[in-house]
Amino acid sequence: MVETYLGSLPSTGRSETWQNVGIKMPDGIVENSAIKGIDPKSMVRVIFNGDFEYSKENSHILSSLEGVMEIKLREILREDMGGTYGVWIWADPIHYPNEKYEFNIMFGCAPENVDTLTQALFAQIDSIQTFGIDIDYISKVQEK
């Protein structure tokens, strides 16, 4: 059905290409609050971004880090601390228009748990930067 519809659309005969409209992430730390609804609930989103040498190997490394962080933060924030139902993590290696990456971590929690859970998140990041990644977590990511 879609093919029939799309196939019947007229062609404009023009060639199109993408255009860089200059959208970029803000510099530094940005904190925003929005108050909506009646029930108190917080949504925490931490985004890291920066320059990135785009390659298949680097994209794989970024994806593997995404998998490790997903497991570690689920274990700590959800299972150990009981502070959230789930942690969502996604990493984006970006090739065009500029080579960069974005690494997103997001979770919902009660407003009174925001600081505690955010500190635990950054403690895990510091731990990985200082001590590296335990081989058990690498094995778990490879099993996925």
Model-inferred region functions:
Residues 1, 41-55, 78-144:
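M16 family metallopeptidases and their MPP-like homologs
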Residues 2, 6-13, 72, 125-132:
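A generic secondary-structure signal for well-formed alpha-helical elements
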Residues 21, 64-71, 111-112, 118:
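Generic hydrophobic, helix-prone segments enriched in Leu/Val/Ile
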Residues 46, 56-72:
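Active/ligand-binding-proximal structured segments within catalytic/core domains
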Residues 75:
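Active-site phosphate/pyrophosphate- and oxyanion-stabilizing loops and adjacent acidic/basic residues
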